[in-house]
Each structure stands twice: as C-alpha cells, then as structure tokens.
Amino acid sequence: MNKNIALIYGDCSSPEIVTQAVRVLDKIAAKHGHTFSYTRAYMGGEAIDKFGDPLPAAELEKCKQSDSVLLGAIGGPKWEGMPGDRRPEKGLLRLRAGMGLYANNRPAKIWPQLADASPLKKSIVDQGIDFIVVRELIGGIYFGEHKTIEQNGEKVAIDTMPYSEHEIERIGRI
C-alpha cells in the first residue's frame, strides 16, 4: 500500500505529538510493507504566523490531494485576541468544509472496568451506557451569523444556526 499523508503539525505542543505519530506510522509501514509519503501543510496558528491566514487555499489543496490528513491540535493563547475570521479555529472549519467532512461520531460507553471512575450515578451506570452522538461539523452555528445588538438599553447576543434541508438529510443518514 502506498499512501500520501498531509501533515498539519498544529500549534503549541502539538508538533511534538505529530512527530511521534509519524514515527509510529513509519514503523507500521516498515513492518507491513507499506509506503507512506508525507506532504507538509500549514493550518491554524502556524499558518497565521507564516501566511497571515488560518488556512490558505494552497494548503487546503495539499490536503485534498492527499489520501489522508494527520492533524495536530489547533489554536492556543498566542492567537486568542485575533478577530473571529482570522482565528486558528477558522482554518479547521474551512478544512472540514473544503474536504466535505461534515460529521463525526462521538461514542459514549462506560466499560464495566471503569464504572467506578464515572461521574454518573451508580444506578445509571449499572443500567449500561452505550450510544453514539452524531455531531454535525460544518453548518449551523459554525457558519451562522454572530452579532451583538442593542435592545431595550442592553446588549443582546445573536447566534444564528442555519441548516439547509440537504444538511439535515445528510446528517440524518449517518
């Protein structure tokens, strides 16, 4: 198997983690006769520092041309004061939208061996918890309008969550 993996090292301590993940992938490749090639891509704070943009079009294209993306954590205190459209997290939203990654599955299960560590009541844990939450990632509140208005002499925050029929049907099929 030959695969090209886009590497986004991410921000703060994340590059150290991604570097070790690449070492693991290389060991897997050697053991199983695979070949992984890597393409460096920038996103988040490191892209802001290098290009002034959380995900330049050329970096998104590198990801689209790859077989997969290994992504480190995005954001950190250094970029917290930036305007909303220039924050590192906007790069992540654009990556998801650009690659059509609109959903993720969030499993919730309490294994018997870990039941005592659960913050939930024992009576609930003893009944068993095993379900999956499907989370929509690129519509609604992520790309809706966010604004503050004056109403009756006080500030009111408004966050719209627009979803098209297509987006709702698509997430419902997961």
Predicted regions, residues:
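Anion-binding alpha/beta catalytic cores of soluble intermediary-metabolism enzymes, centered on
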Residues: 1-12, 30, 35-37, 42-174
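Short N-terminal binding/cap micro-motifs at the start of the first secondary-structure element
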Residues: 13-18
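Short catalytic helix/loop segments, enriched in acidic residues and glycine
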Residues: 22-32
